[in-house]
Amino acid sequence: MLDLKKLRSNTEEVKKALSNRGEDFDVNVIDEVIALDEERRKILVDVEALKKQRNEVSAEIPKRKKAGEDVTEVMAEMREIGDKIKADDAKVAELNDKINYIMLRIPNIPNPAVPEGETDEDNVEIKRWGEPTKFNFEPKAHWDLGTDLDLLDFERGGKIAGSRFTVYKGMGARLERSIINYFLDKHTFENGYTEVLPPYMVNRDSMTGTGQLPKFEEDAFKVENNGYFLIPTAEVPVTNMYRNETLEGDKLPIKHAAYSACFRAEAGSAGRDTRGLIRQHQFNKVELVKFCKPEQSYEELDKLVQDAESVLQGLGLPYRIVRICKGDLGFTAALKYDIEVWMPSYNRYVEISSCSNFEDFQARRANIKYKNSPKEKPQFVHTLNGSGVAIGRTVAAILENYQQEDGSVVIPEALKEYMRCDLLK
């Protein structure tokens, strides 16, 4: 959520920054919310004047009674003032609801470093690590390798739950688990994160706090009759651990790494990478979440990207980093980098991690603040998160990049102690 004061004082600047945001967003709603706020502020001034008048009249009543004067008219005036205050309070509450409705739907303001552009074609590549894997044979896709090696069962996943669900079997299940453990060990022992194992279901307030609601409700799996949502990412429960809290400034930055299953309806994504493990309704991920002071956040974003890179480098998987353009930025981010791993069957790089700085956008929604001393006025923290990284896509990348001509797959060196084998065959 944006700062309403900033909307009032820098209206045209904000409207310009939010133009071409790629969110089907009409910047004219900013004028609407400012008009509603002006109306609310005017009524609040009137209410304060009425309360002052009521206090003055109330103070006169005992004096008049003591003097033996009739207070009937004064009492009637008191009731009339009270009715006006009640009506104005109701109007303010109505305006608050309207303002909040709009504010929750206004996207974050892009950082000046965000490239101009409308689609992912306009994202800017800033780094490559490793070279795309070359083969002297025709490489297989990960879904064929997974089936041939009896690691993945897409057919039974579909029978159990429907399309875009997968059963991991035998060494496939062990590979998934090994990657999870490797990522968590890397981030906690080497990169300085504190591990969290969060709930997989959250309430509406939590989904609103991180920005999934109200805009993306159709992409979420909702549990009927009780208001719970299955989490689309561990970012939601981990960020909301500190909702409505004031953190100690000297404890920042706080860094958490969390493994979780993730659940996404992916409405409207039919036909886009729906074969194999790339776009599933349920998948595993290790998420990195940070809370820091505003002046720390962009340095922490750079470190976050490096931490996500470290696990891919450890696995020897070639990747590139792109800076996301304005039209592809997403609702909550101020600046975002995607890390894309090389997938031979696609002959292109495929997203495996997104790392974002939300500045105080989520903190305002979730009311997460900090202060450096007990007497200091609390300020909103900056929040960041990144995939550290998606597990299923890592499985796919390993199968495709480490495959051999005979159909076997070499285990990356970093995973051998977890897998207790050198080769999948």
Swiss-Prot record:
Its EC number is 6.1.1.11. Pathway: Aminoacyl-tRNA biosynthesis; selenocysteinyl-tRNA(Sec) biosynthesis; L-seryl-tRNA(Sec) from L-serine and tRNA(Sec): step 1/1. It is an enzyme of class 6 (ligase). One of its GO terms (molecular function) is catalytic activity, acting on a protein. Keywords: Aminoacyl-tRNA synthetase, ATP-binding, Cytoplasm, Ligase, Nucleotide-binding, Protein biosynthesis. Pfam families: Seryl_tRNA_N, tRNA-synt_2b. The keyword Ligase applies. Transmembrane segments: none annotated. ATP binds at residues 264-266, 351-354. It is found in: Cytoplasm. InterPro entries: aa-tRNA-synt_IIb, aa-tRNA-synth_II, aa-tRNA-synth_II/BPL/LPL, Ser-tRNA-ligase_type_1, Ser-tRNA-synth_1_N, SerRS_1_N_sf, SerRS_core, tRNA-bd_arm. One of its GO terms (cellular component) is cytoplasm. It catalyses: tRNA(Ser) + L-serine + ATP = L-seryl-tRNA(Ser) + AMP + diphosphate + H(+); tRNA(Sec) + L-serine + ATP = L-seryl-tRNA(Sec) + AMP + diphosphate + H(+). L-serine binds at residues 233-235, 287, 387. GO terms for biological process: selenocysteine biosynthetic process; seryl-tRNA aminoacylation. Belongs to the class-II aminoacyl-tRNA synthetase family. Type-1 seryl-tRNA synthetase subfamily. Homodimer. The tRNA molecule binds across the dimer. Catalyzes the attachment of serine to tRNA(Ser). Is also able to aminoacylate tRNA(Sec) with serine, to form the misacylated tRNA L-seryl-tRNA(Sec), which will be further converted into selenocysteinyl-tRNA(Sec). Consists of two distinct domains, a catalytic core and a N-terminal extension that is involved in tRNA binding. This is Serine--tRNA ligase. It comes from Clostridium perfringens (strain SM101 / Type A).
